[in-house]
Amino acid sequence: MHDGGVIPNRSSLFLGAALLAGQVALAPAAAAAPLLPFQQLVDAAAQRLATADPVAATKWINGGPITDPARANQVLDSVAADATAHGIDPQYVREVFTDQIAANEGVQYTRFGQWKFDPGTAPTSAPDLAESRTQINGLNKTLVDEIALHWNSLHSQGCSQDLSDATAAVVAARGLDPLYQQALASATQSYCQPI
């Protein structure tokens, strides 16, 4: 029974639901939260770190070493050239990417340790390393673009606070676990270099 003993029929329920849906659909969308100054930069660093798991899985399955100095040098040379093209200090960019590579390797070493202690959790399949490298190359470009965009801010007195705020936002948005939080802190440790 409904108010006053009247039972609504299906068509009136459908009409009511449709009207309610229309009201919800017509309601103005909440404005998206504005991005923090370094949020896209830090998010790109987090995305690049996320490649550590599939890369580690590939290396685990194929028996490859975690460190790959030739690949690291190729990445560092490429981002330094990109930095030069942007008119920013290539040595700064090399330093930032050295941290990023080391953090990625740290995650990979952690995964290898976990899989060694608990072989049942070790991967049995992994993507082709070329797929991960294509993703990494794209993120490298994004990172250099973001560094160039925020060059002055990365060298300002307010950098540390902006970096801390952006990191907290990315950690929350991506739900990063303690390992990835530590890796992100390590990957971004050289971002702020006030002049």
Language-model segments: residues:
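Secretory targeting and sorting signals
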Residues: 1-32
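Extracytoplasmic/secreted proteins, especially bacterial periplasmic and envelope-associated proteins
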Residues: 40, 50, 54, 71-74, ...
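Immediate post-signal-peptide N-terminus of mature secreted/exported proteins
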Residues: 33-67
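Secondary-structure edge/capping motif, primarily at the C-terminal ends of alpha-helices
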Residues: 59-63, 111, 118, 150, ...
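Extended amphipathic alpha-helical interaction segments
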Residues: 116-150
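A structural signal for well-ordered alpha-helices, especially hydrophobic packing surfaces
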Residues: 52, 83, 104, 108, ...
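Glycine-rich, aromatic-bearing surface loops/beta-hairpins
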Residues: 151-195
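Structured domain cores in non-transmembrane regions
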Residues: 68-120, 124
